[in-house]
Amino acid sequence: MTDDTEYRCSFCGKEHHQVDDLIAGPDVRICSECVVLSCEIVEDRRNEALAKQDAFIKRKQRSVLEGLPKPAEIYAFLDEYVIGQQKAKRDLSVAVYNHYKRLVSTKSESENEVELSKSNILLIGPTGCGKTYLAQTLARMLRVPFAVADATALTEAGYVGDDVENVLLKLLQDADFDITRAEAGIVCIDEIDKISRKADSPSITRDVSGEGVQQALLKILEGTAASVPLQGGKKHTQYEQASINTRNILFIVAGAFSGIEEIISSRIGRSNMGFGSDLLRKDTDVFDQILPEDLRKFGLIPEFIGRLPIVTAISHLDGEDMIRVLTEPKNALVKQYKRLFSLDGVSLGFDHEALEAIVELALKRKTGARALRSVMESILSPIMFDVPSRGDIESVRITAETVAGGGPHLTMRCARSNYIRSA
């Protein structure tokens, strides 16, 4: 004789004729009404858990945003290391702040929230004026992985040279191969002007190191899951690869764009009927008026330009700026060499005329501020060779005569003397 309980719902106790359906299992039955009720309970608990998770994410997001340096703080930090370039530092401070604010926001975005797009940066300015150094200083402040790549070393896939994904390999290496950290890093691609296409019109032949590289960089700049060859060089199926999502990587591309001044001047001169001559007295005045059409005429393809919505100019460094570069930043060269000499118990000083002479030599090399170190090394290297071996030197003073090839003025611990540099 069959037990009546076999025809009852194990949860509500209703008999099979009281419900639409009764689902049987091993030693248990559940009616259709209890199934619906169970689904509602599960959905309620799921929504409650999601609400708690969303509240936790928002609390964490607020905490991260509170710890994120504000644009004014980023600017102040850059000001300690970079001389001049006020507009560029201001533009970069805002752009970097918005980028990492977007990165934090993206982690808690729902389908109904506005999606924040990434804004990569194009830096334009003469060689040796701090384009790469600005990006490097930003990364150091934010403590994020950073990599610098030379655009001239890149080629289109299938040709001799590095694939564009090698740019990301350097970032991954700086992140100690932590992919999560690398995906929030900063990449600076220098010499981007060197991959401009050779003509204003689309190429009918393969331009593997120019337009081809621009095309290859498009997806990476916009955001894609890129396969990075861990061995470097070209991608190969036999080599191990890592997948990196570039959606949250900030790209800062930089270039001198020599000759673009004429393109801008020509456009402004036509549109202002001669008034442009008053506006173009300085390179910065020209660069501040740059438009996408100028970049296109220079040789960047429209799709590439579109992925660099923030364009800012780096101004040329004159003699006065170079002296400030030598002496004022937190890690100025003069301060570095003074520190080196102090480790040997010797003080180092520079006459203002000596600094002017050093800057004059550096300007002749036409490589901007990066020439300052090599000039300083050539002057101080013979002195740094002899001073550590002598215990009678109290101080060294560099004069204009020292820069011209003479010896520095030395203060001895017991008497004064002159150090004559050997030929």
Curated annotation (Swiss-Prot):
GO terms for biological process: cell division; proteolysis involved in protein catabolic process. Component of the ClpX-ClpP complex. Forms a hexameric ring that, in the presence of ATP, binds to fourteen ClpP subunits assembled into a disk-like structure with a central cavity, resembling the structure of eukaryotic proteasomes. It comes from the Bacteria. The keyword Transmembrane helix does not apply. Gene3D superfamilies: 1.10.8.60, ClpX chaperone, C4-type zinc finger domain, P-loop containing nucleotide triphosphate hydrolases. The keyword Cell cycle does not apply. It comes from Tropheryma whipplei (strain TW08/27) (Whipple's bacillus). The gene is clpX. Signal peptide: none annotated. One of its GO terms (cellular component) is HslUV protease complex. Residues 1-50 form the ClpX-type ZB domain. Belongs to the ClpX chaperone family. Zn(2+) binds at C9, C12, C31, C34. Transmembrane segments: none annotated. This is ATP-dependent Clp protease ATP-binding subunit ClpX. It holds the Pfam family ClpB_D2-small. ATP binds at P126, T127, G128, C129, G130, K131, T132, Y133. One of its GO terms (molecular function) is ATP hydrolysis activity. Keywords: ATP-binding, Chaperone, Metal-binding, Nucleotide-binding, Zinc.
